[in-house]
Regions:
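Cyclophilin-like peptidyl-prolyl cis-trans isomerases
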Residues: 1-193
């Protein structure tokens, strides 16, 4: 997979690049996988986790202030920061290291209107079209910082999301990550599609 980081979210972008360059993410697990929702990783405790060990509480000892940007939303392939819940984190500050990649689902106009009514959200025509065609998780918009997106290899999300999981949505077979920063990467031209 190749992920593009957004310049509109500089704190998250810079932190992610630092952790990738430091090798922090190498050999960590995608420890929480929910089909039709997302795949989550980045827990530093997952590197040497025993089979069946509960994960998700590990962190770097700091958070990142939320960077909510209109136009950056939870479409399929979005890279977003995990965080603690509103009850202990009303500022919606992001985890210093945990992240997720959105798989999501296709949303009809009626389903999207239900989300708007229930959560008091309003989606743009572009968002509605995206959620109706490629899918995503619109109910997370404005609650978690989206700071990048998959630009190549999005099918890997589907493959990981399809693995068999046990308690706490942890894959029964470890799914490890390895990351590096690509310099001078030329994004593929998808205008022909």
């Amino acid at each position: 997979m190749v992920v593009k980081l957004y310049n509109e979210t500089p704190k998250h972008r810079d932190n992610f690049i630092k952790l990738v360059n430091d090798g922090t993410y190498n050999d960590l697990l995608f420890h929480r996988v929910i089909n039709k929702f997302m795949i989550q990783g980045g827990d530093p405790n997952s590197r040497d986790a025993k089979p069946g060990q509960m994960l998700g509480d590990g962190d770097m000892g700091y958070t990142i202030p939320a960077e909510f940007v209109p136009g950056l939303y939870h479409k399929k392939g979005a890279l977003a920061a995990a965080r603690q819940g509103d009850d202990v984190n009303p500022q919606k500050a992001s985890s210093g290291c945990q992240f997720y990649l959105v798989q999501g689902d296709i949303w009809t106009a009626d389903r999207l209107k239900m989300v708007e009514a229930r959560m008091g959200k309003s989606f743009t025509a572009e968002q509605a079209e995206t959620y109706a065609t490629i899918g995503g998780t619109p109910f997370l918009d404005g609650d978690y910082t989206v700071f990048g997106e998959v630009v190549e290899g999005i099918e890997v999300i589907d493959k990981i999301a399809a693995v068999q999981c046990g308690p706490m949505d942890r894959p029964l077979q470890d799914v490890k990550m390895k990351m590096s920063v690509l310099k001078n990467y030329k994004e593929p031209d998808n205008s022909q599609k």
